[in-house]
Amino acid sequence: MAALRYRRFLKLCEEWPVDETKRGRDLGAYLRQRVAQAFREGENTQIAEPEACDQMYESLARLHSNYYKHKYPRPRDTSFSGLSVEEYKLILSTDTLEEFQEMNKSMWKKLQEKFAPTRPEEKHKAWTRVLSRPRT
């Protein structure tokens, strides 16, 4: 029975798309990682809670098949903000979020990152130079 569960999860992982614009935050990539952890021994893995495993699979399968999208249809493909799905994908991409984080940095933080040494030994040398200067 564990082999059947393993094959079902593998099939779901194959069908689940991976969004390359969401590096490190994609549900498809996370799902593949969790299945690999849960089924370390492949088809020979012993499942401690088979009911919970089946329930998890059914929940993921409903999400993948857009069960709730069909059950609760929306009149338009927009949200309260009026943005389309493509616009949301652009905004939520990792590159755009990194740009927003860079924009939100203060001028002082940007200058620190630009001129601060990157290696720990360089930081130590910079501090010893500053501390060894005579104060006037």
From Swiss-Prot:
What job does the chain carry out? Required for the assembly of the ubiquinol-cytochrome c reductase complex (mitochondrial respiratory chain complex III or cytochrome b-c1 complex). Plays a role in the modulation of respiratory chain activities such as oxygen consumption and ATP production and via its modulation of the respiratory chain activity can regulate skeletal muscle differentiation and insulin secretion by pancreatic beta-cells. Involved in cytochrome b translation and/or stability.
Tissue specificity as recorded in UniProt: Widely expressed with highest levels in brain, liver, kidney, heart, skeletal muscle, thymus, testis and pancreas (at protein level).
Q: One biological-process term from Gene Ontology?
A: positive regulation of mitochondrial translation
Organism for this UniProt entry: Mus musculus (Mouse)
Location comes to: Mitochondrion matrix, Mitochondrion nucleoid; Mitochondrion; Mitochondrion intermembrane space; Mitochondrion matrix
Residues of the signal sequence?
Answer: none
How is this protein organized at the quaternary level? Interacts with UQCC1. Forms a complex, named COMB/coordinator of mitochondrial CYTB biogenesis, composed of UQCC1, UQCC2, UQCC4, UQCC5 and UQCC6; stabilizes nascent cytochrome b/MT-CYB and promotes its membrane insertion. Forms a complex, named COMA, composed of UQCC1, UQCC2 and UQCC4; activates MT-CYB translation. Forms a complex, named COMC, composed of UQCC1, UQCC2; UQCC3 and UQCC4; mediates MT-CYB hemylation and association with the first nuclear-encoded CIII subunit UQCRQ.
Transit peptide interval: 1-13
The family database entries (InterPro entries) matched by this protein are listed as: UQCC2 (IPR037698)
Q: Which UniProt keywords apply?
A: Membrane, Mitochondrion, Mitochondrion inner membrane, Mitochondrion nucleoid, Transit peptide
Q: What cellular component GO annotations does this protein have?
A: mitochondrial inner membrane; mitochondrial intermembrane space; mitochondrial matrix; mitochondrial nucleoid; mitochondrion; nuclear body
**Any idea what this protein is called?**
Ubiquinol-cytochrome c reductase complex assembly factor 2
